[in-house]
Amino acid sequence: MNNEIKFLIDTLTKNLVLRVIKDFGLSVKEALDAVYNSQLYDKILDLETGLYYQSAGYNYQLLHKELVKGKI
């Protein structure tokens, strides 16, 4: 993974965590746990999916669905 991709993933992850904190009222630790332990995060790290390149809004829709319904 090159530095550009790592930067995109890190920035996306930060934005997802901030949205989870805002929308679900979780602490920073709880939001980090929710994002890092999600199926979506695993898919973001799988570069073949291309999710790391999609917008935070698009990825948040998937994450929100997973957190509410338990699946993507």
PLM-predicted stretches and their roles:
Residues M1-I72:
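C-terminal alpha-helical interaction appendages
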